[in-house]
Amino acid sequence: GFTNISLDLMYGLPTQTPDDLQRSVHEAFALAPEHISVYGLIVEEGTPFAAAEAAGRLALPSEDAAEEMYDWLMAELPARGYARYEISNFARAGYESRHNLGYWRNVPYLGVGAAAHGYVGGVRWGNESNTRAYIRTMRAGGSVRIPEDTQHTRDNAMEEYAFLALRTAEGVDEEDFARTFGVEIDDVYRAVIQRYIALGLLRR
């Protein structure tokens, strides 16, 4: 059978209560997965959920209830042996997602197929999302890549490196930052770093 199973769970869903979430998570624990991801529902603009919310037809949990769910998850998952290694990801020792860590560490990856996304040479891109158009373009020898980094600059690359790394428990690898960009992180972000350390929001 499978020896490495990951489950994705969501909280803050319509009509969901903290008790509902706890029951779902305890059912997940009963399956003994090696990895669990938890995501809070975000109602994106232009979606059916956004339209339903605007019309008063979406019974989302209150802000207090959603916060209670989050706090419970952050305490319960580590208590059950799942270490938090990224904002939304928890794993038993040695079972951290290589895909997730690669993304947060800015490792290049290829996107293959319609609507796939890739990151190569410091540039992010997505493939044509319409399958018929994708196949037609490929058969004609054309490019299906659509660049996503319309303003790809060194400054943007450094910012992206930093904020992706800050999503992880390991944080920013200062030596790797210096190797990648040829400059010490303090020479670029010293004032920002000092400000957030003083606020208790960042530590070294």
Regions found by a protein language model. Name each.
Residues 190:
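A cross-family detector of function-defining hotspots
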